[in-house]
A protein has these predicted regions:
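Membrane-embedded alpha-helical bundles of multi-pass integral membrane proteins
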Residues: 1-242, 290, 303-341
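Hydrophobic alpha-helical transmembrane segments in integral membrane proteins
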Residues: 345-369
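Asparagine-centered strand-capping/turn motif at beta-strand->loop junctions
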Residues: 385-389
Length: 447
């Protein structure tokens, strides 16, 4: 007699289910659109602004010059890029420790462009239910063909303009526009289409999948949270047990909590999660479920805040908002803020006070020390002088370190604006005036 065992197979992979976010109005949604406008005005507008006769912000990789408003940076100024990356990392740590994934929910490019593409989709195809009906309709439907075609045209237009603007930060945008109109540009045109394709794919189709599976921040955010971090939270003590009820029914008498189980918080979520199941790595902290729940609470006459930004310790101990905020600005956050402020001030001071001149000295390996007419000993050095200003400069070169040290030929050199020039310098001393061996030499270059 054999005993049969029931076996079941659990798949680690599940087919993707399209998320149809519902449009909602509220404070957090309005703030998201404020950030969309601010970030996109900066992104699309900055390449068109001029600083004198040049583009205000331009990363000219070919010429190895980086124009940031007034200053002109060179590869030798790599320390500023390093500092900028450190500032970004510290800012992310600070914002995450205070209020979770604020960056993800309000200013991340993936969120911003997904919001723009969803707004176009909503205007053309309709709200959530209309889009779901349209997707179920046959492709022979003239309405579906017309709306889908118009939506794709709008998406492609935004994506192409985004790609063009992005490349315009690396190639003068007016020159780039003229080249594209003539189908020239080679690699520039390739990168326009590449970035446009990435924008089109990520914001139009992949959407929440980028946040769930591709973005590493979703995975390591738990290491940056603690119990005093403000996150989107469902008040289960107040909301449970959930259930549908008449507006006239007293929920306490019916043994129900304040949650009416309308699922509106799920319908508006751009990643399609149910916040009532607790903190999940897919939550981007956008606050749309807060807007949705507050709208429902207003309609049924219940207090707002069933879903709200709160800390885990505050929810557990039923603290007031004031008590929670006092714990939010804890030593960890103040430490992040102090380091961030110190580093930002140090970078600004360094950038403002930096010398607009770069000098590299290289010993000429092709020429050895030799005795020249006049009984002098000569060594040859190559100096690269980089003019970091936007006006031509005359520089005077001098050297110190040995008695009787002279320069030949003329020690004055002209360097064009934002240009560099190699100068051959011959250093001469009277033969026998210095002991054999190496001696330190100091070059001085003055404008």
């Amino acid at each position: 007699m054999s005993e049969e065992k029931n076996q079941s197979t659990v798949s680690f992979y599940a087919p993707h289910k399209k998320v149809y976010p519902r449009a909602i109005d509220g404070m957090f949604n309005r703030w998201r659109w404020v950030m969309v406008w601010v970030t996109q005005l900066v992104f699309y507008g900055l390449p068109w602004l001029q600083w004198g006769e040049r583009q205000m912000v331009l990363f000219d990789l070919g010429a190895r010059r980086f124009y940031l408003f007034g200053p002109v940076l060179y590869p030798q100024d790599f320390i500023y890029l390093t500092g900028r990356l450190v500032l970004s990392a510290l800012s992310l740590c600070l914002f995450t420790a205070v209020a979770g994934r604020l960056w993800c929910g309000f200013t991340c490019p993936q969120t911003v462009y997904t919001e723009i593409f969803m707004w176009l989709e909503n205007r053309i195809e309709g709200d959530r239910s209309a889009r779901m009906r349209l997707d179920k309709a046959a492709w022979t439907s003239p309405e579906k063909l017309a709306k889908k075609g118009l939506k794709q045209l709008a998406w492609v237009s935004v994506a192409l303009w985004t790609g063009f603007t992005f490349v315009g930060f690396f190639v003068p945008i007016r020159t780039l526009g003229a080249e594209i109109l003539q189908w020239q540009g080679g690699w520039q045109l390739f990168w326009v289409f590449f970035y446009a394709f990435a924008t089109y794919g990520f914001a139009g189709f992949m959407r929440e999948q980028v946040c769930k599976y591709m973005c590493p921040y979703a995975r390591f955010q738990s290491a940056m949270f603690d119990e005093d971090t403000l996150i989107v939270t469902y008040d289960s003590a107040r909301g449970e047990p959930r259930g549908v009820r008449s507006k006239k029914v007293d929920p306490k008498a019916a043994g129900l909590g304040d949650c009416i189980d309308c699922s509106l918080c799920v319908q508006v979520c751009p990643t399609g999660i149910d916040i009532r199941n607790g903190l999940q790595y897919e939550c981007i902290g956008c606050g749309l479920c807060v807007d949705a729940c507050n709208t429902v609470m207003d309609k049924v006459g219940y207090p707002r805040g069933l879903i709200r930004f709160a800390t885990q310790s505050g929810m557990r101990q039923r603290w007031t908002n004031h008590q929670m905020l006092r714990r939010v600005f804890r030593p960890r956050v103040l430490g992040y803020g102090a380091v961030l402020l110190t580093l930002a001030v140090a970078m600004m001071v360094s950038l403002v006070t930096r010398t607009p001149l770069k000098v590299d000295v290289v010993r000429d390996r092709t020429a050895i020390a030799r005795i020249v007419p006049g009984g002098k000993l000569e060594n040859v050095y190559q100096l690269q002088i980089m003019n970091a200003t936007e006006t031509p400069q005359h520089y005077r070169i001098s050297a110190q370190g040995l008695e009787g040290l002279t320069l030949a030929p003329d020690s004055t050199v002209q360097v064009p604006a934002t240009g560099a020039r190699w100068v051959s310098v011959q250093l001469q001393i009277p033969y026998g005036s210095a002991a054999p061996g190496s001696h330190p030499i100091h070059f001085t270059v003055q404008a």
